[in-house]
Regions:
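Hydrophobic membrane-insertion alpha-helices, especially the h-region
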Residues: 10-27
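Electrostatic cytochrome c docking/interface patches
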Residues: 31-52
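Extracytoplasmic electron-transfer domains, predominantly the class I c-type cytochrome c fold
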Residues: 77-122
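Extracytoplasmic/periplasmic C-terminal soluble domains
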Residues: 82-83, 144-157
Length: 157
């Protein structure tokens, strides 16, 4: 009985390992393209641009620094989808096209939706940097409901 269990475990591990190796052959997720930068916004300051690069550019620009793990399936599939979606929502490198949601960028940072908590945990931003990013994005891109959100936060105190 014990030999059968050990054999079953080894078979399962072997199948999982084989499946992992086979999915590495799927070409999707490793075409790490960075199209040319066409035009960036007129930044209100170099600090705003630097903070935006740190917090946003790896998903919302054509200047993505692809991490090493973006070459390993199935993580590569998720990273590729994330960048494609991010660029379609807001792309700081293609400012010549309509960026309908740009005015909401500051709000999403203020509400903690962006940058996502799983995004580059080794380079988390301080609260001061996040506040400066929100202020800079408001000045550069405009505002949505940021003031209303701030007023609601003040009411909670």
């Amino acid at each position: 009985m014990r030999i059968l269990t050990k054999k079953l475990v080894m078979t399962i591990v072997g199948v999982i390992l084989a499946a992992f190796l086979v999915i590495q052959l799927v070409p999707y997720g490793r075409a790490h393209s960075n199209p040319p930068v066409i035009m960036e916004p007129s930044w209100d300051s170099p600090i705003t641009r630097d903070l935006t690069v740190k917090a946003c550019f790896d998903c919302h620009s054509n200047q993505v620094v692809w991490p090493w793990y973006s070459n390993i399936a199935p993580i590569s599939w998720w990273v590729q989808d994330h960048v494609v979606e991010g660029r379609s929502e807001l792309n700081f490198s293609e400012w010549d096209r309509n960026q309908e949601e740009a005015y909401e960028a500051a709000e999403t940072v203020l509400e903690g939706e962006m940058p996502p908590s799983y995004y580059k945990p080794w380079s988390r931003m301080s609260q001061t940097d996040l506040d400066n990013l929100v202020t800079g994005l408001e000045a550069t891109l405009g505002t949505a409901k940021v003031e209303e959100h701030r007023d609601n936060d003040d009411d909670d105190d």
